[in-house]
Amino acid sequence: MQTNRLIGINGGTFDPIHFGHLRPALEVLHALHLDEMRFIPAYQPVHRASPSVSAQQRCEMVQLAIQNQPSFKLDTIELDLGGPSYTVNTLEALKKAEPDASFVLMMGTDAFAKFNQWHDWQGVLNLANIVVTHRPGEPVPRDGEVGQIFMNHWVPNLTEASGQIVDLPVTQLDLSATALRSYLKNGDPVDYLMPENVARYIYEHQLYQ
């Protein structure tokens, strides 16, 4: 592996952020010996509905969630870029700002199963490596075009600055932001599902009501 900075990329709408985002990111950080993990809220998600709260509020919730983990950083680059949040554009901007850094894009199996449908997926691999996170014992998709991409780029350990894919079993909580928004709308407790300070922020700002 290169001796330059190794930065993990954890992108998402984070609407709201919860422990299902945070725990896998921590395990990837340590397993791949990353220098830091960037949390990048999407400005305008391409493959899902628009977020229910403002980009600024989602960023503030992310900052609260990660403030006690020094290796976790909030990066607002997709908000700064504006427009649809295509990963390849984000990586191009990151690489331009930090040409000596190497980037590792976190992706769950559900997202990776549609990777061949992403805008310029080849460009993504030209700019970064990918870590596909999955539950222990759960296979990574190996059928069809996505399976071929995985097999063509898979390595046991990252040795280059881009173009490689590793897979990593992580603790994955059966938890979604959709379910959390439903709990919050119904007035159900969200204790032990998200950081306490994030829940407090949501209640104070009357979000997801």
From Swiss-Prot:
InterPro entries: Cyt_trans-like, NadD/NMNAT, Rossmann-like_a/b/a_fold. GO terms for biological process: NAD biosynthetic process. It catalyses: nicotinate beta-D-ribonucleotide + ATP + H(+) = deamido-NAD(+) + diphosphate. The keyword ATP-binding applies. Signal peptide: none annotated. Disulfide bonds: none annotated. GO terms for molecular function: ATP binding; nicotinate-nucleotide adenylyltransferase activity. Its EC number is 2.7.7.18. It comes from the Bacteria. Gene3D superfamilies: HUPs. Pathway: Cofactor biosynthesis; NAD(+) biosynthesis; deamido-NAD(+) from nicotinate D-ribonucleotide: step 1/1. Coiled coil: none annotated. Keywords: ATP-binding, NAD, Nucleotide-binding, Nucleotidyltransferase, Pyridine nucleotide biosynthesis, Transferase. Belongs to the NadD family. NCBIfam families: cyt_tran_rel, nicotinate (nicotinamide) nucleotide adenylyltransferase, PRK00071.1-1, PRK00071.1-3. PANTHER family: NICOTINATE-NUCLEOTIDE ADENYLYLTRANSFERASE-RELATED, PHOSPHOPANTETHEINE ADENYLYLTRANSFERASE. Catalyzes the reversible adenylation of nicotinate mononucleotide (NaMN) to nicotinic acid adenine dinucleotide (NaAD). This is Probable nicotinate-nucleotide adenylyltransferase. It comes from Hydrogenovibrio crunogenus (strain DSM 25203 / XCL-2) (Thiomicrospira crunogena). The lineage of its organism: Bacteria, Pseudomonadati, Pseudomonadota, Gammaproteobacteria, Thiotrichales.
